[in-house]
Amino acid sequence: MTAPKTDRRILRTRALLRQGLAELMQEKNAGDITVNELVAHANVNRSTFYLHYTDIDQMLASVEAELLERIEASVQAHPIDPHQAQIFPLVGDLFALMAENREICAALLGPHGDMAFLLQIEAILSRYSLQVLADAYPDRRADLDSGYSFCLSGCVGLIKNWLQAEEPAPPEVMAQRTYRLIHNAMRGLCPGVEA
């Protein structure tokens, strides 16, 4: 049985609110944005906002939860096999997801974003990648931790830069670059470990 479809008007309203939130978060922290400010910016009635969300914090939590759910689904769809260098499909999916949600991802990962959101993404990636590698190479844990931290920080910087770019490279190009950087870094930092 398929899930019931959401009314187009609801989807449109949520998209307007989400876009408005992303635009306002380019200027200020979500905690400093009022419902009145958001609905005026998004050109949506205040009462309509309250049909969907209780406040800005709940809206932000809802948007983040949806994105985290999709990130986790992508990671689960492409399990990491430490003996096969097959992370490219996962990296491709993650860049496609971010491209599809560019404005809100740029806001969440930008200077006025939510550090907790980034930490949750890191936890998902760690749970599904670092742990698999650590289980496969228990005697290399220190090397893996260093390599993973290096790659993760580099990827976060690369993603932030890409999301803020005026003329960003296509997601497929970014996925290829990122994969190459991860693969080369892990090979250099952890000889004998495939990433």
Predicted region positions:
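Basic, helix-initiating cap at the start of DNA-binding domains
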Residues: 1-28
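Residues in the recognition helix of alpha-helical DNA-binding motifs
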Residues: 20, 52, 62
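Helix-turn-helix
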Residues: 24-58
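Short, basic, alpha-helical segments at the C-terminal edge of helix-turn-helix-like DNA-binding modules
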Residues: 34-35, 63-72
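Hydrophobic alpha-helical connector segments
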Residues: 75-104
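Amphipathic alpha-helical packing segments from all-alpha helical-bundle domains
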Residues: 89, 112-137, 145-156, 183, ...
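C-terminal peripheral helix-coil segments that are non-catalytic and often amphipathic
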Residues: 134, 153, 161-195
